[in-house]
Design a protein with these regions (language model features):
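Short, charge/polar-rich alpha-helical segments
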Residues: 1-23
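Short, charge-rich amphipathic interface segments used for partner binding and complex assembly
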Residues: 19-69
């Protein structure tokens, strides 16, 4: 399904989401550092997985944004 959203609104939404994803990624990097300092492997694994998903999402959003240009 295609929604009726102007290119300007799409671009703003994508840019806002990229910013939010970067902030979320930064928080996960901090969580990873804390977990590494404590030797908490479960949190290390989760933060590492979260970072990979966030990086992928950023790439998808950036590609969509580039397609609008």
């Amino acid at each position: 399904m295609t929604f009726n959203v102007s290119p300007e609104h799409k671009a703003q939404l994508l840019q806002d989401r990229i910013t939010a994803l970067n902030l979320e990624g930064y928080q996960n990097e901090l969580n990873l550092k804390s977990a590494e300092a404590l030797g908490n492997q479960e949190v290390i694994d989760q933060a590492t997985a979260n970072i990979a998903v966030i990086q992928s999402a950023i790439a998808v959003h950036e590609a969509e944004l580039a397609d609008l240009a």
